[in-house]
Amino acid sequence: MSLINKEILPFTAQAFDPKKDQFKEVTQEDLKGSWSVVCFYPADFSFVCPTELEDLQNQYEELQKLGVNVFSVSTDTHFVHKAWHDHSDAISKITYTMIGDPSQTITRNFDVLDEATGLAQRGTFIIDPDGVVQASEINADGIGRDASTLAHKIKAAQYVRKNPGEVCPAKWEEGAKTLQPGLDLVGKI
């Protein structure tokens, strides 16, 4: 089921904050008020997951410039996130919040729970300041994501939000021409 244009559901969870090296509570309200990226992954101490999360960290500075808060989520506990951060070269670079979801509440809310394994699927969600999902990507377990595409999607989502009535065509870049859907464009693209 698509979550596009749907408001995120309530949750409360414990998270590891690598910037402060401490645990904290996170709720759906923390994903509101600014743009957010929520990146679900199957498990800590695994294989593809650390490559994805390191890639996301490599894009973190650019995402911060766009006013985006970044969160990762797995069904591991916040304690396991801390241990992984302390022992993995790739994960030790992470500075964004790592949410633990052992109750599977958030994972179910975003419809990325693999019921057979109890683990999260590889899902990425872009959420606007109102807490509404604007974009999503879900991949099979063996297919890692490319975080470099996030900034492009966020810029387009931010532009469309600020410019009602305009849409961004494929491969749109900031400053490029947009489209204004209407009868005058039907059959002319």
UniProtKB/Swiss-Prot annotation:
Superkingdom of origin organism: Bacteria
The keyword Cytoplasm is assigned to this record: yes
Induction context: Induced by iron and osmotic shock. Repressed under metal-depleted growth conditions and by manganese-rich growth conditions. Negatively regulated by the ferric uptake regulator (Fur) and PerR.
Where found in the cell? Cytoplasm
Question: What region holds the Thioredoxin domain?
Answer: 2-159
Cited InterPro entries? AhpC, AhpC/TSA, Peroxiredoxin, Peroxiredoxin_AhpC-typ, Peroxiredoxin_C, Thioredoxin-like_sf, Thioredoxin_domain
Quick one: where is this thing mainly located? cytoplasm
- Pfam families referenced in this protein's UniProt entry, alphabetically: 1-cysPrx_C, AhpC-TSA
Q: Which terms under GO biological process does the entry name?
A: cell redox homeostasis; hydrogen peroxide catabolic process; response to oxidative stress
> Per UniProt, which keywords does this protein have?
Antioxidant, Cytoplasm, Disulfide bond, Oxidoreductase, Peroxidase, Redox-active center
**Which residues are named in the active-site annotation?**
C49
Q: Name one GO cellular component term.
A: cytosol
The record's catalysed reaction(s) read: a hydroperoxide + NADH + H(+) = an alcohol + NAD(+) + H2O
Give the EC number(s) under which this enzyme is classified: 1.11.1.26
Annotated transmembrane regions = none
Q: Which GO terms describe its molecular function?
A: NADH-dependent peroxiredoxin activity; thioredoxin peroxidase activity
Q: Key word ATP-binding present in the record?
A: no
PANTHER family recorded? ALKYL HYDROPEROXIDE REDUCTASE C, THIOREDOXIN PEROXIDASE
**How does this protein assemble?**
Homodimer; disulfide-linked, upon oxidation. 5 homodimers assemble to form a ring-like decamer.
The function of this protein is: Thiol-specific peroxidase that catalyzes the reduction of hydrogen peroxide and organic hydroperoxides to water and alcohols, respectively. Plays a role in cell protection against oxidative stress by detoxifying peroxides. Is important for survival under desiccation conditions. Not required for virulence although is necessary for nasal colonization.
**Annotated family:** Belongs to the peroxiredoxin family. AhpC/Prx1 subfamily.
Spell out the note in the miscellaneous section.
In S.aureus, the removal of hydrogen peroxide appears to occur predominately via KatA, with AhpC acting as an alternative. The active site is a conserved redox-active cysteine residue, the peroxidatic cysteine (C(P)), which makes the nucleophilic attack on the peroxide substrate. The peroxide oxidizes the C(P)-SH to cysteine sulfenic acid (C(P)-SOH), which then reacts with another cysteine residue, the resolving cysteine (C(R)), to form a disulfide bridge. The disulfide is subsequently reduced by an appropriate electron donor to complete the catalytic cycle. In this typical 2-Cys peroxiredoxin, C(R) is provided by the other dimeric subunit to form an intersubunit disulfide.
Q: What is this protein called?
A: Alkyl hydroperoxide reductase C
